[in-house]
Amino acid sequence: MRFKGSGAYHSPQGTIALLGGPYSNHVALRAAAEDARRRGAVALFCLGDLGGFGPNPGKIYPILDEFGISTIAGNYDQSLAERRPDCGCGYTHPRDNEYAQRSYDYTDRRTTDIERAKLAKLPPSIRFTRANRRVLLCHGSPRRVNEFLWESACSDAFLMRLLRDAEVDTLVCSHTGIHWQRRLPDGGILINVGAVGRPANDGRTETWYALLEEGSDEARFIPVAYDFESLAREMEEESLPAEFVETIRTGWWTTCLEILPAKERARGRF
């Protein structure tokens, strides 16, 4: 894990990989990192939320180190580092918060002091210039670490103002768990990379990450096939909620549904 307190980074050229929250899914994270390297990625970035949802959160850190993945802090990471009582996910519905709390309590109990110290060093964002475009990597949005940028809820005008206020041409975010991107009328680009640790509520067991390839300013979303059944069994061994395990095995969300806007929820099973 590369800790850059300033959030500055050298300007990476060539193909780079952008990964959303691992959510303790160490099997998918490793599969995505290996796939990105095979595809020629010269730099890998993770947009935070290392823990939550999956089992044995400590298995994430060696993978970040092994592949040299530069990482920023998500709301989960900030909460764990500061020993807050909850994940600060930004949910408002009691059912969403109930499952979020069960996930957070499990992760909190299994996070060591050494790991908390690592999380405390993660920068909130990373900025760099690539092919004359100013790029910002953040977790939720430039305004709030837990702001949800849903495709159906974000107008062009809102996104253009968001990028303009952040002084960037390309904004890369995560937090929602569902990947999407949009080129704006003024040339700005919003890329939400979703999450590498959980399916995108699309009925597929694969998870997703994004590639920014040399010569392109738009992302290509890459599905990650991994041994989801081994992860599901590990989750069961750790007595994680059956609803979480079902999502891994089916690709459909069973929790954190109430936060979804109507259009995003209509694409799912529940």
How should these model regions be labeled?
Residues 156-196:
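Anionic-ligand binding region
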Residues 11, 36-41, 129-131, 164-167, ...:
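Glycine-rich phosphate-binding loop signature in dinucleotide/nucleotide-binding domains
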Residues 3, 7-9, 14-19, 24-109, ...:
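Core catalytic region of metal-dependent phosphoesterases/phosphodiesterases
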Residues 18, 71, 171, 190-192, ...:
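Conserved beta-strand scaffold positions in the cores of enzyme catalytic domains, especially
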Residues 11, 183-270:
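Acidic, His/Gly-rich catalytic cores of divalent-metal-dependent hydrolytic chemistry
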Residues 8-17, 128-136, 185-189, 217:
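Beta-strand-turn-beta hairpins that frame and shape the catalytic cleft
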Residues 23-28, 52-55, 76-82, 143, ...:
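Active-site environment of divalent metal-dependent phosphoester hydrolases
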Residues 91-98, 131-166:
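Active-site-proximal segments of metal-dependent phosphoesterases and phosphodiesterases across multiple
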